[in-house]
Amino acid sequence: MSLQVQSAISLKPFNTFGVDVQARLFAEAHSDDDVREALAYSARHDVPLLVIGGGSNLLLSADVQSLVVRMASRGIRIVHEDCLESIVEAEAGEPWHPFVQSCLELGLAGLENLSLIPGTVGAAPMQNIGAYGVEIKDVFHSLTALDRETGELREFSLQDCAFGYRDSVFKHQVARWLILRVRFKLSRVARLHLEYGPVRQRLDEQGIDRPTPFDVSRAICAIRSEKLPDPAVLGNAGSFFKNPIIAAELYATIKQQHPGVVGYPQDDGQVKLAAGWLIEQAGWKGYRDGDAGVHKLQSLVLVNYGQASGLQLLSLARRIQTDIAERFGVELEMEPNLY
């Protein structure tokens, strides 16, 4: 058995909030065989299995009475290419931002707007991660997942994944599917997405009127670094709440009472609100209770100033949710998975 299972391991290094809880059992999976061994170990010892990647989408509220398996598989390869595009396959454990940079270095465009997002390749489709006008679904080709019920491999197409806003079939069937590797369809002819104002403004300030994908990536890295705290310095999980999508009638009511509300019309007639604006308007920006707080520059980000527990962070999140619901009639949904 190559899988090394350890007991009573702190998960503080394995979640970007830096919450110090223990895993009853812990192992790292470097291959498909390791994953299968972990499933067999879980069944043999009747212990639940929790699979994690970079730990950037977790809020751990208590010690984890499971076998925690960290996906550590690595590998990037081009599986198909022609003069216009390439299909790039990456193992689930590949860190996301270095993968984006590797693709740019290969002359492949499409992922640049998703630069500097924490986490791993395998976790990206689960959330259908997105930023600055681009989502995973826009560059997705297919993926390979292990069916935890049967032990068989299955290929998922774009349609199979049922991608939505920060959503996918894998998020709803997390106990069944374990993503092993993901393939992306990337272009050799850049089609840049510069609709997001600050990106265009940053490029203009630098005198770049014909940007390359690398230029866009660097601009987005600079913007994210200014807006969002580095988890290595200040514990956080990035954007903590989803931007809520509400009925147009509710949006009109809110806008009448709060003319400055930020809303984005959707194709189905609903309106997406900026959750950060709601939280800031409610006075939570920069709030701190012990070591749990709301970031002073970005109200969408909850932070751990050092020793906050998962329960303290969760309590703060619940208070914010209640306040926003009472003030605006809007329900905020947490992005991180709660354990």
From Swiss-Prot:
Give the subcellular location.
Cytoplasm
Enumerate the spans annotated as FAD-binding PCMH-type domain. Answer: 19-189
Entries under PROSITE patterns matching the protein = FAD_PCMH
- Record-linked InterPro entries: FAD-bd_PCMH (IPR016166), FAD-bd_PCMH-like_sf (IPR036318), FAD-bd_PCMH_sub1 (IPR016167), FAD-bd_PCMH_sub2 (IPR016169), MurB (IPR003170), MurB_C (IPR011601), MurB_C_sf (IPR036635), Oxid_FAD_bind_N (IPR006094)
The alphabetized list of GO BP terms reads: cell division; cell wall organization; peptidoglycan biosynthetic process; regulation of cell shape
Catalyzes what?
Answer: UDP-N-acetyl-alpha-D-muramate + NADP(+) = UDP-N-acetyl-3-O-(1-carboxyvinyl)-alpha-D-glucosamine + NADPH + H(+)
Q: Can you provide one Gene Ontology molecular function annotated for this UniProt record?
A: FAD binding
Specify where it is mainly localized.
cytoplasm
Q: Sorted alphabetically, which keywords does the UniProt record give?
A: Cell cycle, Cell division, Cell shape, Cell wall biogenesis/degradation, Cytoplasm, FAD, Flavoprotein, NADP, Oxidoreductase, Peptidoglycan synthesis
Enzyme class (EC, first level): oxidoreductase
Where does this protein act, in terms of pathway? Cell wall biogenesis; peptidoglycan biosynthesis
EC number assigned by the record: 1.3.1.98
Protein origin, superkingdom? Bacteria
Q: What do the Gene Ontology cellular component annotations say?
A: cytosol
Cofactors (names): FAD
Catalytic residues, per the record, are: R166, S239, E335
Per its database record, what is this protein's job? Cell wall formation.
Family the UniProt entry places it in: Belongs to the MurB family.
Protein name stated in the entry: UDP-N-acetylenolpyruvoylglucosamine reductase
**Which gene is the coding source of this polypeptide chain?**
murB
